[in-house]
């Protein structure tokens, strides 16, 4: 009897050279999982079929690098934002530019299409969020509230809300109809890179550079659970179509999570590096990553991945819509999104033949739109993907065939054949998570939850590092032994970059030391600030903090803005240095500042007093700005929490 061929659970599909220069952004079409759009430093947007090596279409018109791209749900429109702040919308079926939208003052960091209406949301480095009406070619509303770049935008499935994630460590929820913020979700300690709505329930997931994923209840506006211990910054998450689990694209692995309670269902090794986007089609998860000018695509067979804590359900068929949301046994039922009633499966297309129905564009916009082109590189692939939509109804949508899985390597096949289950069973240390058994094993009692790891106040162990990460890993059957060259390549990875960083820091410190030896402390601090490297500022402040007599009032005016940055840093040593410096300033200079501001004006001209009064006003303004940050962090637990509470008491006189 022939031995059945064992196929891989995850494999690399293809690698392409997507642009003539570096790739800066990419996105997968979520409806088909087969359409890929890439934006590059060559100012172009290129479209690809995920399983073909040739570019389908190249969209031109931007005059600066493309920073963000997004496809709408039916994959008929694409929007791209550039480094200059301009936004362009193309019609893929008509193969032409549809709109040029101007208004942001900095590069576009995030985009999203409204699921039903013809609206686009954009987030920028200028901290603003704008909602655009594609039909009228204008900004409908501007949402303000973030203090740093907006990295991700997502509309809710019912189209009533907009979630935003930013570098200021917060997630905000906006009501589109009321035009105001509904709630702010603090809790992350690093920039938030991605947010994703649950497909059915009032639940939101957010991933951050602090290596955590948080789940938020959108009825009670509070955190449901927090998954910690991700191997790196969280950049890409995706809910399963039936909402039973969340996929997280980690560094070289795919992790499957539940949230009530927080636990890890499965971990699959995928050598995709830093995955940029995920999509699901035909029970296969497609992941794409980019490096320099190359884009790589990977496939994970979800039929061999554990997605719930109970017996696996029948796979969701992509060629037919869900009749109703499948209940998640691991979570209580929440309120379900109410989709608006529609007469067709896609929004009404923009009419191009009636110029009077929309605002007349300026002559500059006309010129920009005339210069924008859609160059069809492969007519056969273009007609196959886009042209049939004009004459063939897309209800039900066209079904694509799953990608065939390649067989395992010979050595791996022999080992896999000896296993009772074809699924790859790899155990990873996942802190604070409960790893459930795979089906068909049914556990009568839940597995005990791991005790949370406590980071000691004294740094007798590396913060953020776990000894289990350095233990010998379980041998992976499908991976061959590393040859010497590959092993050395892995060891050297990042070495050149670190050398550049350390060399630059050494040069900057030499510059500051040269000024310091002249005895001018204020000029030394000014030069450190001008370098625009917080590590140099921290090194200098650690020296100044040791001798309180070095502090002067004019030094405070320079240091206080840097202290505000340090208090918001994700590095513990930076925060600690900022707190120490702020405490010294408050103890030595706050009484002087308050007395100077409260004193009546003097008679006659006193130049030195006027200069001192001006410095006191600057310090008071900066301290007021910092006081809000200190108050928000005074509720933290641990050593930093007590330090911030002490600072909050010292700053009470500012109120």
UniProtKB/Swiss-Prot annotation:
Keywords of this entry: Cell cycle, Cell division, Cytoplasm, Cytoskeleton, Disease variant, Lissencephaly, Microtubule, Mitosis, Phosphoprotein, Repeat, WD repeat
GO cellular component: centrosome; cytoplasm; cytosol; growth cone; katanin complex; membrane; microtubule; microtubule cytoskeleton
Region (Disordered): 311-422
Signal peptide bounds: none
Feature: compositional bias, Polar residues: 340-351
GO terms for MF: ATPase regulator activity; dynein complex binding; microtubule binding; protein heterodimerization activity
Residue spans of the WD repeats: 18-58, 61-100, 103-142, 145-184, 187-226, 229-269
Segments of this protein annotated with the region Interaction with centrosomes: 1-300
Pfam families (alphabetical): Katanin_con80, WD40
Region annotated Interaction with PAFAH1B1, chain positions: 285-434
InterPro entries the UniProt entry points to: G-protein_beta_WD-40_rep, Katanin_C-terminal, KTNB1, WD40/YVTN_repeat-like_dom_sf, WD40_repeat_CS, WD40_repeat_dom_sf, WD40_rpt
Modified residues (Phosphothreonine): 395
Region described as Interaction with dynein: spans on this chain: 1-284
Principal place of residence: cytoplasm
Biased composition (Basic and acidic residues): 352-374
Chain intervals for the UniProt region annotation (Interaction with KATNA1 and NDEL1): 433-655
Gene Ontology annotations of biological process type: cell division; cytoplasmic microtubule organization; microtubule depolymerization; microtubule severing; mitotic chromosome movement towards spindle pole; negative regulation of microtubule depolymerization; positive regulation of apoptotic process; positive regulation of microtubule depolymerization
Functional description taken from the UniProt entry: Participates in a complex which severs microtubules in an ATP-dependent manner. May act to target the enzymatic subunit of this complex to sites of action such as the centrosome. Microtubule severing may promote rapid reorganization of cellular microtubule arrays and the release of microtubules from the centrosome following nucleation. Microtubule release from the mitotic spindle poles may allow depolymerization of the microtubule end proximal to the spindle pole, leading to poleward microtubule flux and poleward motion of chromosome.
Annotated family: Belongs to the WD repeat KATNB1 family.
PANTHER family registered for this protein in UniProt: KATANIN P80 SUBUNIT, KATANIN P80 WD40 REPEAT-CONTAINING SUBUNIT B1
Quaternary structure and partners: Interacts with PAFAH1B1. Interacts with KATNA1. This interaction enhances the microtubule binding and severing activity of KATNA1 and also targets this activity to the centrosome. This interaction is weakly competed by KATNBL1 which has a lower affinity for it. Interacts with ASPM; the katanin complex formation KATNA1:KATNB1 is required for the association of ASPM. Interacts with dynein, microtubules and NDEL1. Interacts with KATNAL1; this interaction is weakly competed by KATNBL1 which has a lower affinity for it.
Disease the record associates with this protein: Lissencephaly 6, with microcephaly: A form of lissencephaly, a disorder of cortical development characterized by agyria or pachygyria and disorganization of the clear neuronal lamination of normal six-layered cortex. LIS6 features include hypoplasia of the corpus callosum, severe microcephaly and developmental delay.
Protein name, as recorded: Katanin p80 WD40 repeat-containing subunit B1
Native source organism of the sequence: Homo sapiens
């Amino acid at each position: 009897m022939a031995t059945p061929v064992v196929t891989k659970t995850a494999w690399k599909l293809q690698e392409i050279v997507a642009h003539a220069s570096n790739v800066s952004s990419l996105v997968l079409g979520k409806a088909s999982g087969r359409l890929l759009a890439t934006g590059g430093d060559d100012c172009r947007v290129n479209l690809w079929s995920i399983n073909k090596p040739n570019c389908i279409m190249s969209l031109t018109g931007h005059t600066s690098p493309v920073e963000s791209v997004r496809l709408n749900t039916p994959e008929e429109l694409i929007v791209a934002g550039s480094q200059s702040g301009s936004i362009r919308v193309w019609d893929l079926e008509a193969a032409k530019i549809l709109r040029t939208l101007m208004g942001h003052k900095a590069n576009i960091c995030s985009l999203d299409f409204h699921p039903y209406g013809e609206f686009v949301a954009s987030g920028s480095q200028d901290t603003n969020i704008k909602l655009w009406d594609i039909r009228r070619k204008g900004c409908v509303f501007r949402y303000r509230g973030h203090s740093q770049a907006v990295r991700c935008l997502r509309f809710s499935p019912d189209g009533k809300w907009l979630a935003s994630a930013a570098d200021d460590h917060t997630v905000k929820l906006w009501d589109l109809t009321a035009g105001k913020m509904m709630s702010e979700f603090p809790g992350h300690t690093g920039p938030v890179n991605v947010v994703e709505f649950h497909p059915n329930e009032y639940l939101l997931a957010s991933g951050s550079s602090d290596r955590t994923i948080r789940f938020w209840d959108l009825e009670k506006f509070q955190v449901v659970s927090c998954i910690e211990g991700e191997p790196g910054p969280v950049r890409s998450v995706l809910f399963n179509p039936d909402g039973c689990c969340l996929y997280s694209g980690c560094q070289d692995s795919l992790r499957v999570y539940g949230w009530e309670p927080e636990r890890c269902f499965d971990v699959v090794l995928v050598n995709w590096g830093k995955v940029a986007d995920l999509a699901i089609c035909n029970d296969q998860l497609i992941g794409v990553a980019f490096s320099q000018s190359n884009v790589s695509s990977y496939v994970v067979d979800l039929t061999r991945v554990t997605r719930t804590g109970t017996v696996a359900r029948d796979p969701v068929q992509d060629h037919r819509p869900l009749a109703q949301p499948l209940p998640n046994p691991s979570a209580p039922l929440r309120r379900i999104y109410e989709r608006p009633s529609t007469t067709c499966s896609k929004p009404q297309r923009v009419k191009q033949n009636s110029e009077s129905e929309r605002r007349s564009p300026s002559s500059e916009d006309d010129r920009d739109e005339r210069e924008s082109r859609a160059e069809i590189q492969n007519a056969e692939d273009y007609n196959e993907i886009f042209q049939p939509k004009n004459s063939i109804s897309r209800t039900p949508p066209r079904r694509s065939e799953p990608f065939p899985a390649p067989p395992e390597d010979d050595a791996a096949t022999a080992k896999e054949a000896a296993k009772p289950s074809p699924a790859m069973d790899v155990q990873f240390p996942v802190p604070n998570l409960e790893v459930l058994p795979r089906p068909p094993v049914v556990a009568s009692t839940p597995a005990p939850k791991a005790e949370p790891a406590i980071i000691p106040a004294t740094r007798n162990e590396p913060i953020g590092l776990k000894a289990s990460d350095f233990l010998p890993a379980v041998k992976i059957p499908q991976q061959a032994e590393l040859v010497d060259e590959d092993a050395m390549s892995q060891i050297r990875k990042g070495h050149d970059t670190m050398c550049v960083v350390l060399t630059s820091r050494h040069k900057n410190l030499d510059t500051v030391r040269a000024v310091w030896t002249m005895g001018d402390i204020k000029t030394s601090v000014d030069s450190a600030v001008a370098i625009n490297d917080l590590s140099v500022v921290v090194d200098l402040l650690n020296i100044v903090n040791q001798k309180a007599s070095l502090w002067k009032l004019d030094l405070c005016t320079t240091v206080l803005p840097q202290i505000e940055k340090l208090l918001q840093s994700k590095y513990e040593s930076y925060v600690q240095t900022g707190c120490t410096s702020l405490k010294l300033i408050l103890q030595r200079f706050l009484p002087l500042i308050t007395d100077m501001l409260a004193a009546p004006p003097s008679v006659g001209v006193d130049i030195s007093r006027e200069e001192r009064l001006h410095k006191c006003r600057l310090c008071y303004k900066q301290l007021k700005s910092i006081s809000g940050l200190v108050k928000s962090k005074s509720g933290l637990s641990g050593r930093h929490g007590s330090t911030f509470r002490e600072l909050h008491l010292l700053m009470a006189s500012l109120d």
